[in-house]
């Protein structure tokens, strides 16, 4: 007789283990920011925490090799993104380049490993952090540009150096390549939408937090037609619930240090809920997390929250419209009997990239 399958662990035990791991990851993610903040005394370097998340996701989704390339590319791209955001045309062109890169990575199944690169660079293009005692953004300040590149490199390289050792015994899912019939529409959709939005936001100075709209588009658009509508609805619901939390924080908390600590707590909860089947729970927790981390004042927390709610709704509408067009085109191809086109030698080379 075959041995009986082991009974699943109780839910509280699973959540406790996830919470413990999430706490460790979040606490480690703060270390680069603390070190750089002690050196520079500039709040802008707390973006190292975001860079840490970028490197951590790249390690999980693509392996140490892909993560290393991702961190180096992000560090080099950071000053370019900040300078490019000085004019709408240059900023939109650089965003188009990043989206084309992400679309190409989807052919190899590596788009999830590199997704945060254009998302974080959207912030650098549209709304880079303040620098200096005057709290101004000088996109041509060489010191500022250099330190932001260092910030993204230091924050991103830490998980690349630390976590592969602990993850070596885990069976991580292999990247899933996509045929050109799926990766090409995906590339076109994200490039057209994000490029157009970037130009619009840079041309309209009132849209200081328009990077939320770009991140909404990039997160919601899927390769193929799997789960787009469901994920869009859950993201909107979760973000609106997170907005309620942000509104309460604005009324009760006026210290940026306290807000940062609150952001860490929500970050732990968000990581714990990340692998939950209920995506809206994760979105409700990650919304106040990111807003608390990226706002430079308690007033801006409220403004960021309000604009994010608008951006999510607009982005969701754009994504659903674009998805309807691409899904319809895909079904039309299938009805005509056209088979997917796939670059087999390139896809077979995926392991060499990881």
Regions found by a protein language model. Name each.
Residues 137-158, 300-322:
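Structural signal for the N-terminal portions of transmembrane helices
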Residues 193-253:
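Transmembrane helical segments that form the transport core of multi-pass membrane transport proteins
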Residues 33-50, 80-97, 148-154, 205-213, ...:
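Structural signature of hydrophobic alpha-helical transmembrane segments
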Residues 176-200:
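Membrane-water interface at loop-to-transmembrane-helix junctions
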Residues 176, 333-354:
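Short, highly charged, low-complexity non-transmembrane loops/tails of multi-pass membrane proteins
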Residues 81-180:
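Membrane-interface helix-loop-helix junctions at boundaries between adjacent transmembrane segments
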Residues 58-70, 88, 103-117, 225-234, ...:
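Membrane-helix interface "capping/anchor" motifs
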Residues 1-75, 323:
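N-terminal signal-anchor module of multipass membrane proteins
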């Amino acid at each position: 007789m075959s041995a009986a399958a082991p009974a699943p662990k109780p839910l509280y035990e699973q959540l406790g283990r996830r919470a413990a791991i999430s706490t460790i990851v979040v606490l480690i993610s703060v270390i680069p920011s603390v070190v750089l903040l002690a050196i520079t005394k500039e709040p802008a370097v707390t973006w190292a925490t975001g860079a840490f998340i970028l490197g951590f996701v790249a390690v999980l989704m693509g392996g140490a090799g892909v993560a290393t390339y991702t961190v180096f590319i992000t560090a080099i791209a950071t000053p370019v993104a900040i300078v490019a955001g000085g004019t709408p045309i240059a900023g939109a062109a650089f965003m188009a380049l990043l989206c084309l890169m992400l679309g190409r990575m989807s052919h190899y199944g590596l788009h999830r490993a590199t997704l945060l690169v254009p998302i974080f660079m959207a912030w650098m293009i549209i709304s880079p952090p303040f620098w200096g005692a005057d709290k101004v953004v000088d996109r041509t300040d060489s010191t500022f540009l250099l330190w932001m590149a260092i910030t993204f490199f230091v924050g991103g390289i830490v998980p690349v150096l630390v976590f592969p050792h602990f993850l070596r015994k885990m069976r991580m899912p292999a990247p899933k390549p996509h045929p050109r019939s799926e990766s090409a529409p995906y590339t076109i959709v994200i490039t057209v939408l994000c490029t157009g939005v970037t130009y619009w936001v840079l041309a309209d100075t009132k849209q200081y937090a328009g990077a939320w709209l770009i991140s909404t588009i990039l997160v919601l658009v899927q390769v193929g037609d799997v789960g787009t509508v469901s994920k869009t609805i859950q993201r909107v619901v979760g973000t609106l619930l997170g907005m309620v939390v942000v509104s309460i924080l604005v009324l009760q908390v006026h210290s940026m240090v306290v807000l940062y600590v609150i952001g860490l707590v929500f970050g732990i909860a968000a990581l714990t809920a990340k692998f939950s089947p209920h995506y809206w729970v994760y979105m409700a927790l990650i919304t106040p997390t990111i807003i608390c981390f990226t706002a430079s004042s308690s007033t801006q927390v409220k403004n960021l929250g309000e604009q994010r709610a608008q951006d999510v709704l607009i982005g969701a509408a754009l994504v659903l419209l674009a998805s309807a067009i691409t899904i319809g085109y895909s079904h039309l191809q299938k009805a005509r009997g056209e088979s997917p086109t796939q670059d087999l030698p390139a896809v077979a080379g995926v392991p060499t990239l990881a």
